[in-house]
Curated annotation (Swiss-Prot):
GO CC field: extracellular region
Lineage top rank: taxon: Eukaryota
Keywords of this entry: Amidation, Neuropeptide, Secreted
BP terms from Gene Ontology: neuropeptide signaling pathway
Sequence similarity: Belongs to the FARP (FMRFamide related peptide) family.
Compartment list: Secreted
Protein name in UniProt: FMRFamide-like neuropeptide FLP8
Keyword Cytoplasm found: no
Phenylalanine amide modification, residue list: F9
Principal localisation: secreted
Keyword RNA-binding attributed: no
Length: 9
């Protein structure tokens, strides 16, 4: 899981 993915909301 990319923890950076939530920043791309």
């Amino acid at each position: 899981v990319s923890h950076n993915n939530f920043l791309r909301f």
